[in-house]
Every structure is written in structure tokens, then in C-alpha cells.
């Protein structure tokens, strides 16, 4: 045991850095179960250290079991000593001792004395504490040979063993420890035997002591094994801690190295980034340079293209010039030939002597005989020219002579000087006799030279004269040639004048014939007018004789010049100073007053307002008037005291509005410059109908969530009773109808038509706009403020209220449209759709809308109601929510066929004779009977005034029945003229009976009405004739004037005059389309009287006192690409084959409908909008104020292919809308040239010829006397449409400058529907080519 404890630390090397794991046995398991030393706190480490310190002490104390074991061993030793010891056993027991001796102490000397015997107690203590024995103390340092269990050197370098060697080392250490344990046990046994030898004991005692010692030794061995395992674990932990420290050190070094590497990497990354930035910048600069080069090249390419186009044009012009040059050369050749001939003639005539005036003899002959009198001025000019040339010739001759004389003088002087020099030279030199003779002979030579020199000027003068004469002859020949040309021109002009004279004579004869026809027509019309006036006077005499109103009185009532005597209720006596004078009101007008007095707000309202003294005001709108606003008021009980006065037209629309509509009143809170709706209330208007006094009431103010926020005190009233006003309105309408019937009764057919349309059945259509859902604003991030607008039939536009900031607005808007059931209405219901537009009030862009819904009206023509949600689509044909619409009739709808007479049933007009005395007697008898009936009906009418509305409906039914009876009577008596006249008289009597007995009683006293009937004939004219041509022309001119007023609304300019002239020609030629519009003025009678016998077939509503006379027209909602609408509007005539529409102008509807054409036989072009670039030169040009767009197409005139009106030049970022569409007929039979034109564009080799060209033109103002100029071109490729097979819908085209087509100045948005037509034309033409 002593050796076990002492040698245990020596089993492990002092510096073992091997990182091998623990043994794979129980020790390994124990090590893994123990916590790491680094994770244990200080307290646990101290406890464990004390426990390890006490364990050796406990181990040293022998347990009873160990003591028993020791006793048994001693007993065995004693027995072996008593007997003869076994040598082998002794060797075995001494072998460990021998092996331990070198480690226990140094080799003892052979002369060492033997140890002294130790006492028993000392031996016992030595046995219990073997580590204290001196002789057995073990050194701590290796002092001799290696231990037997160590296989290799003790000292090893760290980190020398590979990782795979760790398990092997652990297994080896385990084997060494296992082999060491038997040696230690052997050593213990030998030690015990020595003790036994020292203290011999008895066998009994020995046997008693052996058992406990043996047990104690076993226990000690077990504890020692456990202790050894724990020590190993601790040592292993210490080793691991050292290893951890080393690893931490290496990790720190690695981290330092890593930081250095990171720094180096960052430096390298920065360098690379800098290099990359430099390369990137260089690359971008290169890209920019390449872009600049590309733009330059593109500009060059565009310029080259334009040059190429110009070159093509120049080539064409060059060819033309070449042809002209050839013609000029031929003409020059002819002129040269004629000139040569004339020159020869002149030269031949020059040999003949000239007269005193130096003129050739043939000139006088030409003047006197050949040339006409018109050439005399030219001959005079020629004579003056000849005189001038003669004077000029004399002057030139004189100058030439002077020059020649000067030249001769100079020659003579020069010769004289030479002679003097020669004489001087001869004087100085000695002269010989020969020279003197020569000098003497020289004077004789001088006269000869003078004679030669004098003869030379004469010859030269003759040559000059002949040259001048030839020049004069040439000029004279040229003058003669010009005179011949002038003669030819005069002859041609004479022929032209003769042609003009013949045309003038034909025109004059035609005009005379037309004048005679016109005079004849005027005579007929005057005859008819006189006959009508005589009949009117006769009937008025009958009316006066019976005390009934005449036509003048009817006119007074119809046009309001004679106010009816209304039985008004007495007004209140406490009227204020600000009251309106009732005498200023029209008879059919009334005054409605709405007074907002005071509001009482609840604490909840003040809490919601966030102020105890809020500043509030109220807004409300009544009928079709603008919104009114009260003044500001502060406090929880604001006092407004504000009265709104409305002058309204008393009709059934107002009655229905007051009966079923409530006025919405909004209470706003004002905060600085902003305000918001605090509460909303509704004011019911039906209580005001029963009285003319003030109707006081309280309106509950509710918040957005329905909570009660207070009440509002108000009062309202109608200043005049509504029932008499309605009666006056009805009487006025019927008076106008009677006047129109009496005036338009010139012909029987027109009378029947006017009567049937006047008494056409009435109905009322109710249109309700309930709500919209899912609306999206065109501006991102904002909610729209929507309102709805639509137009039904010929009525004006109707719009709803504006709902601020709502994507799901709730309108509940109802509109009533009283209509006459006519064929036009039925046709409109069966073929058209109601376009409902939703606009955003906060959208600044004009012409834009949130959505559009198409509501088909066909169910209404079938007496069915329409109700449902309809999808809304924006201008880009994208869905933008839905709208709920409801349309239904007030009463049963019947088609107009049941109320109109068929063509076969209508009697033919025949000539009528003047009335005889017998007919007048019959008429008087019938009148007396009818007057008695009128008296009875007047009595009944006085009793039934309160139930007037119901009775009117019954009367209308009775009138319809009477008309049917009258028609039956007419059918039976068509052949007899007298009976036919009597029937017409009966009809007119019935008409007046229904009118006078029911309507005129309140206007005239009872004593003025006699008990007789009044016969009124619808018309008594000789025969059925066509409408007069003059009346038609006047009506058409009226249409032209009204169209131009609506279309242009300004003084027509140059282009406007051209458009009006073209339109007027079409209208006057009878090729126009009927323009349906309703004028809000009573011009039916005047139209009928001025136009001759024109039917007034519609009832017209009185004008509103708030507005001037207006003209309303049915502008069906624009749908540029609705093929069904376009097909239904096509015409067969040449002028009406195309149709132009404009969103701001009237829509022309056709008179006659034709079979819709296929898509391959027509094309539609629409010019939608226009916008200019802000940097374009057009924007800065002040001379350009208005623009329009035009294009050229084959044989169509520009008046049809240009926008109907010019618009203001758009500002920067603004877009103007034309919405000008045109359907072009491409019929293969009638318009083959147009199809060939399109085929040529598709096959054009030149890019310019294959493009559709739009031209933007500036339109000067009226006061500017300037011409229109082209400011831009836009091109559309037809080949793209042909290849894609798709129509173009609102495509933006670039507008280029005319001077430089590489510069873009704006955008033009157009649409073209021609894909099917282009495919059909291409297929047809190619088949014709290859067939």
C-alpha cells in the first residue's frame, strides 16, 4: 500500500502535453461524468481539494477486512517457515523485493549492519503507516533503472504523437498499471511476512487476526483503486487545463495572425475597389462617348434619310426639268429656224430703198392690212423705238467720226514728228547728193499718202453703217416675232371670251327660268297664305260672335304677354323689406324661400369638434341651382339667420322634386383656411306644397357614424300656390299646341301628322344612380371626389352631387324624364345605350374620367325595367369599379306603332272647293250642339277643380278615343269631298272642345263664353303638294347657321367659312343628316310662319328664368370605337358616307338607316389628343395661338379630314382633346380608287409613301390676316397594322418639325381601325394581280 501511494504520481510524466483522451473504461466514464474544472466555482474546488487531502489519511488506516487479510497472510508465512520452505515460493516472494530495492534506496554496502529489531507497537504503527518508515521511504526522483512497466523513454516532446496514437498510449498505460498491481501486492505480502517474522505469534491469534486484516486489505485495495482512478482523473483534468491554456495561447496567436490577414485583405480590397472604380468610371465615360456617337450617327442617319427623300423628290423634279429642257431646246430650234428665215427676209428687203422714215415698205402694209386694231399700240411703241434707235445711230455715227478725226490728227502729228526727227538727223550728218535728191522727192510723196488716208475713213464709215443697219433689221425681226405671238394670244383670248359668253348666256337663261319658277311658287304660296288668312279671319269672326278667345288671345297666353288671372291666396301681412316683388315674376314662375335660422349642438358634437366655441357654417343645394352657403357663426348654438330665394319654373318636374326629394344640409366646421363636414341633416320639401305660409321645422344633425350631434331650426315656403301655376303652365303648352295645329293645317297630311304627334302618349322615365363601388383615383395615394354625369335622349346633361374623398360613394340620385312616345324615342331605345360617366372633381386634367358604363336601353323599349351593377372602364379600357343603376317607366310603355296611322290608312289629299252657303249652315247647326255640351262640361269642371290631375288623365284617354273615332270616320268617307270636309270640321271642333272647355274657363268670365261650337278646319287646300323648295332651303340655312353657332361659337375665319360653305352646300342639296336638338324657346309658330308649312311636332318647354335662351342637342356619349354605333350611322349618299363626331358638339344622326357594312369595307380614323414638348419652339412662338390637325386621304376633301374646330395651343405639360373620328367607306364597287390607294401605300418602296401623314396646322386668329402654316408632322406606319393584324387604339405618335424631322416637338394620340380592311384589300389586289 505504501508503494502504491508513493509511486502513483511517478507513473505519469511531469510534462506530458499529449492530447490523448482518457481510457475507454470506467475511468473514461468517470471523467466524462465529472464537470470541467473551468466550469466549477471556487467553493466546489475547495471542497474537492479537502476531500482529496483527507482521502490518503483514510486509506492509510487499515480496515477490519484488511487486517483479517494480513493475519491470514502472516499465518501462511508462519506455516511456511515452520515447514521446509518452498524455494519457488520464496523466489516469488523475494522477486518483488529485489525489484523494488533499487528504487527504494541506493545499493547498500555489503558491510552494512543488520537492522535492529523494532518493538511490537512500532511495528504495528509501521504496518499501519508504511509511508513513515525510514527504511522504506521512496525517493521522488528517478535514481536508478527504469521502472519495469515503462516501455519507452520517460521524457517525450510535446505534440509528437499523432492523434491516432492517443488511444494506444491510454491502453498501454492501463496495461502497465494492471501489471504493477500484482507486484505491489507481492511487496505488501513480503512486508507483512517480515513483520510476522519479527513478531511471532501463536497460530490461534494469527488465525484470528488474519481474517479482519484480510478483509481490511481488500477494502483498502478497493479504495486504493478508486482513489487511483480519481487521482488519474484529476491529473487528466490538470493536463487538459494545461492543454487548454496552450490552445488558448495558440488561438490568440492565430487570432492575431487572422487580424493581420484581415487588415492585409482590407488593404488589398480597397486597392481593388479603387481599381474597379477607376475602370468603371472609364467604362461609363466610354459608354457615354458611344452614346453620343450613336446619337450623332442616328441624327446623321435621319438627315441622310431626309436627304434621300429630298433626292427622290429632286430626281422627279430633275426628270421634269429634263423634259422641259428638251421642250425648250425644240422651241429654241424652231425659234432659231424662224429667226434665220426672218433674217433672210430682212436682208433681202434691205437691198430695197427705204422711205423717208427709214421704215421698210412691208411694215406699213402689215400695219394697214394684216394686223388687227389691237396691235396699233405696239406699232406705235415700235415707231418710237425706231426713232430712238435712229437718234442713237446718228449720235454713234457722230461719235465715230469724231474719234476717227482724232485718230487721224494723232497720226498726222506722229508722222510730222518723225519727219522732223529725220530732218534733224540728216542735218547733223553729212548728206550725200543722193540723199538730197530723196529729200527733194519727199514733198511729192506727201500728197499721195494724204489721199490714201482720206479714202480709208470713208470705207470704214460705210462698213459701220451697214453693221448698224443689220442690227436694226435683227431687232425689227424680233419685234415682228413678238407681235405675232401677241396676235396668237389675242386670238386665244377671243375664243375664251366666246366660251365665257356662251356660258353666261346659258346661266342667264337658267336664272330667268328659276326666277319664273320662283315667282310662280311665290304666287302659289301667297294664294295659300291669303286663303289661310281668310279662313283665320272667318274663324275669328265666329269666335268673337260666340265670345270665345281668338288666336291673338291664344298667342298672349302662349307667350306670356297676357298674364292669366290667377286666384291667389292672400299673402301674409308681415312681409319683410327684402321680399321679392311678385309682380316681376312670370306667370309660370314661383318663388321658393329656404331660411336657415339656428343650430343647437350637443356636447358630443362639441367633443367631436374639439372646441367649445366652434366656428361653423352650412351648405345646401336646391333643385338644379348652385350650392348656397350661410355666413360663419361661432358657439354651441350658432345663429345663421340666412335666407335663400329661388325663382323656379312651376311645372311637373318641380312638383315631383318637391314631393319626393329631400335637401341635404351639411354643417361644416371652419378652422383657419380649412374646413370639414361635422354633421349632415336632411330637409323634407313635401310639406311646402299645401300652403303659402312659412313651414317651420327642425332637421336632425347626424355624424358620420349616425350619432346625434344636434338639431337645426329652419323654415321654408312657396310664395305662390303651386296648383294655379301648374294650370297656367299646362294652358300655355296647350295654347302653343293649338297655335301650331292651326298654323300647320295648310295640308291635310301634315295636319294628321302634327295631330298624331301632338297627342302622342306621354310617359315618364325614372333614372336612379344609387352608388359606386371600388373607384380608384388617377392620382396615387388619394381618394377621388366622384360625381356621375349622363345624358338621355334630347335632354340636357344630368349630373349628381359630388361626394368628397370616397372610393365607394352613395348618391341615391333620381331624375325624371317626361317624354313623348314617338318613333324617334323608340328608335333611340332600341339602338342606343345610355353612357354613364364618373368624373373626379379634383382631377385637374380636362377630358379625363374615372370610368364609363354602357347601359343598353333595349329592355325599356320592351316595357321592362333595368336594374343592376355595371362595370366601369377608364379611358385605357381597364376596369375601375362598378356602378349601380336603375331605370323604369312610370306607366306602361307602348310602342308608337299603336298610336300612328299607317301609310295605307292615311287619305290622299284631293282638291277642295270653297265653302258654300249650305256648308256654313251645317257648321252653325253643329256648333250650337257642341256649345251646349261645352256648357255642361264647364259646370262639371268647376266642381272638379280639386281633382284636376286625375281628370286630365281621363280626358287624355277620351281624346285618344275621339281621335281614333275620327280616323275611322275619315277612312269611311275618303271618296267624298263634302263628307271629308265635314269630318275635318268635326275633328277641329273636338280639338277645341277638349281645349276650351277644360282649360280656358279660368282665363275668361262665364258670360264671355257662348253655348256654341267652333269649327276649326285643319286645312282646306286644293291638293297634296310637296313642301315648298324655298321653305326647305330656309330651314336648311337655319340648320347651317345654328350648327355654325354651336360648332364654332365665334366669328368664322377662313377655314371655318370653308367648312360652313361645304356643309351648307350639302344641306341645301338635300344630302345632310337630320340634326335633332331641342331649343328652349317658343319659336315653333315663328318657324312655321316663316318656313311656309313646316310641322311643329314636339312640345317645347319654357326657358328657365335664370338662363338665357339656350339650344340643347343630343350629344350621345362619345365612344370612338363602338362599331355598332358607327355602323348604325353610315349613310348611302356620297356626302353622308362618312360621319364625324366631336365630344363637344352635336352628334349627327342619320335620317335613313342602311345595312351595316363589314369591317373589311370601311376604316375608322380618330384624332384623340395633342400635346407639345415644353422645350419645343412652338411653345415660345407667340404667333401660334390655335391649332388643328388634318390628314389627306385619296379623294376626300380637307374639309372632311380636318378637325371641325381649332383649339387653343396647349400649355407645357397640358394635353388638348379633339376626339374627332371619321369612318371612311371602302366599298369595292363605289370606291375602288380608295382601295387601290391603300394597296399602293402597302406596296410603296419609299418609306414616306407607305406612311399615313398627319399635319398639325396653326390657325390664325380672326383679327390676324395671316395664312395657316404647318407646324409639325406625325407619321403612322400602315405596314405595322397589316403585319400585326391589330387595330391601333390611342397610340402616341411623335410630332416632328417640318424644318428638321429629327427634332421632336410633341405627341399626337390617334386611333386607326383598319386591320380587317387592309387584309381584305391586300388579298383582293394580290388575287387580281396573279389571276
From Swiss-Prot:
Compartments (UniProt record): Cell projection, Cilium
Residue stretches in coiled coil: 236-352, 498-546, 908-999
Record keywords: Cell projection, Cilium, Coiled coil, Sensory transduction, Vision
Entries under InterPro entries matching the protein: C2-C2_1 (IPR021656), C2_dom (IPR000008), C2_domain_sf (IPR035892), RPGRIP1_C (IPR041091), RPGRIP1_fam (IPR031139)
Residue ranges, compositional bias (Basic and acidic residues): 41-67, 194-220, 1022-1039, 1088-1115
Gene3D superfamilies according to UniProt: C2 domain
Composition skew (Polar residues), residue ranges: 77-86, 183-193, 351-367, 1129-1141
Stored PROSITE patterns: C2 (PS50004)
Region (Interaction with RPGR): 1136-1326
GO process terms (BP): eye photoreceptor cell development; neural precursor cell proliferation; retina development in camera-type eye; visual perception
Protein name per the record: X-linked retinitis pigmentosa GTPase regulator-interacting protein 1
Amino acid at each position: 500500500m505504501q508503494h502504491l501511494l508513493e509511486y502513483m504520481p511517478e507513473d505519469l510524466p511531469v510534462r506530458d502535453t499529449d492530447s490523448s483522451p482518457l481510457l475507454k473504461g470506467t475511468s473514461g466514464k468517470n471523467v466524462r461524468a465529472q464537470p470541467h474544472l473551468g466550469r466549477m466555482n471556487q467553493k466546489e474546488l475547495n471542497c474537492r481539494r479537502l476531500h482529496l487531502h483527507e482521502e490518503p489519511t483514510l486509506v492509510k488506516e487499515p480496515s477490519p477486512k484488511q487486517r483479517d487479510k494480513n493475519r491470514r497472510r502472516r499465518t501462511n508465512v508462519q506455516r511456511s517457515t515452520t515447514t521446509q520452505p518452498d524455494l519457488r515460493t520464496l523466489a516469488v516472494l523475494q522477486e518483488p523485493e529485489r525489484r523494488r530495492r533499487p528504487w527504494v534506496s541506493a545499493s547498500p554496502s555489503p558491510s552494512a549492519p543488520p537492522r535492529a529489531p523494532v518493538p511490537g507497537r512500532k511495528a504495528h504503527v509501521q504496518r499501519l503507516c508504511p509511508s513513515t518508515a525510514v527504511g522504506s521511504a521512496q525517493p521522488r526522483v528517478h535514481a536508478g533503472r527504469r521502472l519495469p512497466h515503462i516501455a519507452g523513454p520517460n521524457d517525450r516532446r510535446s505534440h509528437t504523437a499523432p492523434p491516432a496514437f492517443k488511444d494506444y498510449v491510454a491502453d498501454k498505460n492501463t496495461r502497465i498499471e494492471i501489471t504493477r498491481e500484482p507486484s505491489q501486492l507481492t511487496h505488501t505480502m513480503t512486508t507483512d511476512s517480515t513483520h510476522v517474522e519479527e513478531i511471532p505469534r501463536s497460530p490461534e491469534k494469527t488465525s484470528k487476526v488474519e481474517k479482519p486484516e484480510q478483509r481490511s486489505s481488500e477494502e483498502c485495495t478497493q479504495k486504493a483503486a478508486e482513489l487511483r482512478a480519481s487521482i488519474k482523473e484529476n491529473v487528466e483534468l490538470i493536463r487538459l487545463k494545461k492543454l487548454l491554456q496552450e490552445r488558448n495561447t495558440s488561438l490568440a496567436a492565430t487570432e492575431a495572425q487572422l487580424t493581420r490577414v484581415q487588415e492585409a485583405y482590407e488593404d488589398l480590397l480597397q486597392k481593388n475597389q479603387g481599381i474597379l472604380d477607376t475602370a468603371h468610371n472609364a467604362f461609363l465615360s466610354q459608354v457615354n462617348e458611344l452614346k453620343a456617337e450613336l446619337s450623332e450617327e442616328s441624327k446623321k442617319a435621319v438627315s441622310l434619310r431626309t436627304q434621300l427623300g429630298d433626292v427622290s423628290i429632286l430626281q422627279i423634279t430633275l426628270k421634269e426639268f429634263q423634259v422641259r429642257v428638251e421642250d425648250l431646246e425644240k422651241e429654241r430650234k424652231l425659234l432659231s429656224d424662224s429667226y434665220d428665215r426672218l433674217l433672210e427676209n430682212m436682208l433681202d428687203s434691205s437691198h430695197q430703198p427705204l422711205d423717208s422714215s427709214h421704215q421698210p415698205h412691208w411694215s406699213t402694209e402689215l400695219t394697214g392690212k394684216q394686223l388687227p386694231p389691237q396691235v396699233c399700240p405696239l406699232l406705235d411703241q415700235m415707231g418710237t423705238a425706231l426713232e430712238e434707235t435712229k437718234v442713237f445711230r446718228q449720235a454713234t455715227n457722230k461719235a465715230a467720226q469724231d474719234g476717227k478725226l482724232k485718230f487721224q490728227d494723232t497720226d498726222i502729228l506722229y508722222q510730222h514728228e518723225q519727219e522732223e526727227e529725220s530732218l534733224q538727223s540728216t542735218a547733223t550728218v553729212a548728206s550725200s547728193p543722193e540723199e538730197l535728191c530723196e529729200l527733194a522727192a519727199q514733198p511729192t510723196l506727201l500728197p499721195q499718202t494724204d489721199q490714201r488716208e482720206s479714202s480709208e475713213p470713208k470705207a470704214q464709215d460705210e462698213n459701220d453703217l451697214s453693221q448698224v443697219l443689220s442690227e436694226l433689221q435683227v431687232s425689227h425681226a424680233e419685234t415682228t416675232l413678238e407681235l405675232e405671238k401677241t396676235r396668237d394670244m389675242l386670238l386665244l383670248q377671243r375664243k375664251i371670251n366666246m366660251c365665257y359668253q356662251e356660258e353666261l348666256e346659258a346661266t342667264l337663261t337658267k336664272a330667268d327660268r328659276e326666277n319664273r319658277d320662283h315667282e310662280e311658287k311665290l304666287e302659289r304660296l301667297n294664294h295659300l297664305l291669303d286663303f289661310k288668312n281668310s279662313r283665320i279671319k272667318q274663324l275669328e269672326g265666329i269666335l268673337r260672335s260666340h265670345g270665345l278667345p281668338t288666336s291673338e288671345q291664344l298667342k298672349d297666353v302662349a307667350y306670356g304677354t297676357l298674364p292669366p288671372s290667377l286666384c291667389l291666396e292672400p299673402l301674409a301681412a308681415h312681409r319683410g323689406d327684402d321680399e321679392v316683388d311678385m309682380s316681376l315674376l312670370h306667370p309660370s314662375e314661383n318663388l321658393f324661400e329656404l331660411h336657415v335660422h339656428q343650430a343647437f349642438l350637443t356636447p358630443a358634437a362639441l367633443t367631436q369638434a374639439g372646441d367649445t366655441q366652434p366656428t361653423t357654417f352650412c351648405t345646401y343645394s336646391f333643385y338644379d341651382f348652385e350650392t348656397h352657403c350661410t355666413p360663419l357663426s361661432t358657439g354651441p348654438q350658432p345663429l345663421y339667420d340666412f335666407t335663400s330665394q329661388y325663382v323656379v319654373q312651376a311645372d311637373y318636374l318641380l312638383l315631383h322634386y318637391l314631393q319626393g326629394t329631400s335637401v341635404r344640409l351639411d354643417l361644416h366646421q371652419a378652422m383657419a383656411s380649412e374646413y370639414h363636414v361635422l354633421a349632415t341633416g336632411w330637409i323634407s320639401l313635401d310639406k311646402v306644397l299645401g300652403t303659402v305660409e312659412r313651414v317651420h321645422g327642425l332637421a336632425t344633425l347626424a355624424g358620420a357614424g349616425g350619432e346625434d350631434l344636434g338639431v337645426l331650426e329652419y323654415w321654408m315656403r312657396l310664395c305662390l300656390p303651386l296648383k294655379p301655376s301648374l294650370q297656367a303652365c299646362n294652358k300655355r303648352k296647350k295654347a302653343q299646341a293649338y297655335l301650331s295645329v292651326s298654323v300647320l293645317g295648310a295640308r291635310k297630311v301634315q295636319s294628321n301628322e302634327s295631330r298624331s304627334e301632338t297627342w302622342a302618349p306621354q310617359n315618364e322615365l325614372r333614372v336612379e344612380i344609387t352608388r359606386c363601388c371600388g373607384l380608384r383615383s388617377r392620382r396615387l395615394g388619394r381618394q377621388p371626389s366622384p360625381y356621375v354625369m349622363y345624358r338621355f335622349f334630347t335632354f340636357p346633361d344630368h349630373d349628381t352631387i359630388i361626394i368628397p374623398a370616397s372610393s365607394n360613394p352613395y348618391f341615391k340620385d333620381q331624375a325624371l324624364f317626361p317624354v313623348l312616345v314617338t318613333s324617334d324615342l323608340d328608335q333611340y331605345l332600341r339602338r342606343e345605350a345610355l353612357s354613364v360617366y364618373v368624373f373626379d372633381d379634383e382631377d385637374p386634367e380636362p377630358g379625363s374620367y374615372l370610368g364609363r358604363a354602357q347601359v343598353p336601353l333595349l329592355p325599356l323599349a320592351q316595357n321592362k325595367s333595368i336594374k343592376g351593377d355595371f362595370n366601369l372602364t377608364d379611358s385605357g379600357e381597364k376596369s375601375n369599379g362598378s356602378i349601380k343603376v336603375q331605370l323604369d317607366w312610370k306607366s306602361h310603355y307602348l310602342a308608337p306603332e299603336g298610336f300612328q296611322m299607317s301609310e295605307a290608312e292615311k287619305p290622299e289629299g284631293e282638291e277642295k272647293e270653297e265653302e258654300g252657303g249650305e256648308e256654313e249652315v251645317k257648321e252653325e247647326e253643329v256648333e250650337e250642339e257642341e256649345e251646349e255640351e261645352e256648357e255642361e262640361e264647364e259646370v262639371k269642371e268647376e266642381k272638379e277643380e280639386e281633382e284636376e290631375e286625375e281628370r286630365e288623365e281621363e280626358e287624355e284617354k277620351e281624346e285618344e278615343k275621339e281621335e281614333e273615332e275620327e280616323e275611322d270616320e275619315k277612312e269611311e268617307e275618303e271618296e267624298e269631298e263634302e263628307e271629308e270636309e265635314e269630318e275635318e270640321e268635326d275633328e277641329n271642333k273636338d280639338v277645341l272642345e277638349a281645349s276650351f272647355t277644360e282649360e280656358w274657363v279660368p282665363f275668361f268670365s262665364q258670360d264671355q263664353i257662348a253655348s256654341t261650337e267652333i269649327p276649326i278646319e285643319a286645312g282646306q287646300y286644293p291638293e297634296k303638294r310637296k313642301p315648298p323648295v324655298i321653305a326647305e332651303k330656309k330651314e336648311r340655312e337655319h340648320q347651317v347657321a345654328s350648327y355654325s353657332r354651336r360648332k364654332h361659337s365665334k366669328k368664322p375665319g377662313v377655314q371655318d367659312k370653308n367648312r360652313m360653305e361645304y356643309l351648307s352646300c350639302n344641306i341645301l342639296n338635300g344630302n345632310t343628316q337630320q340634326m335633332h336638338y331641342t331649343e328652349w324657346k317658343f319659336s315653333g309658330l315663328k318657324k312655321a310662319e316663316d318656313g311656309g308649312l313646316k310641322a311643329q311636332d314636339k312640345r317645347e318647354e319654357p326657358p328657365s328664368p335664370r338662363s338665357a335662351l339656350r339650344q340643347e342637342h343630343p350629344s350621345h356619349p362619345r365612344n370612338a370605337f363602338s362599331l355598332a354605333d358607327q355602323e348604325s350611322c353610315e349613310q348611302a349618299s356620297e356626302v353622308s358616307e362618312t360621319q364625324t363626331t366631336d365630344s363637344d358638339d352635336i352628334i349627327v344622326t342619320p335620317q335613313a338607316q342602311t345595312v351595316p357594312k363589314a369591317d373589311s369595307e370601311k376604316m375608322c380614323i380618330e384624332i384623340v389628343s395633342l400635346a407639345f414638348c415644353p422645350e419645343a419652339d412652338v411653345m415660345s412662338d407667340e404667333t401660334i395661338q390655335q391649332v388643328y390637325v388634318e390628314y389627306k386621304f385619296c379623294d376626300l376633301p380637307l374639309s372632311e379630314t380636318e378637325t371641325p374646330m381649332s383649339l387653343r395651343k396647349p400649355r407645357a405639360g397640358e394635353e388638348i382633346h379633339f376626339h374627332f373620328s371619321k369612318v371612311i367607306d371602302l366599298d369595292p364597287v363605289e370606291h375602288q380608287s380608295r382601295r387601290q390607294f391603300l394597296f399602293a401605300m402597302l406596296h410603296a418602296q419609299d418609306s414616306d409613301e407607305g406612311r399615313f401623314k398627319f399635319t398639325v396646322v396653326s390657325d390664325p386668329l380672326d383679327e390676324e390676316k395671316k395664312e395657316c402654316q404647318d407646324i409639325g408632322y406625325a407619321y403612322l406606319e400602315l405596314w405595322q397594322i397589316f403585319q400585326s393584324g391589330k387595330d391601333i387604339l390611342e397610340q402616341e405618335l411623335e410630332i416632328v418639325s417640318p424644318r428638321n424631322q429629327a427634332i421632336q416637338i410633341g405627341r399626337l394620340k390617334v386611333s386607326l381601325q383598319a386591320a380587317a380592311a387592309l387584309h381584305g384589300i391586300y388579298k383582293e389586289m394580290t388575287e387580281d394581280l396573279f389571276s
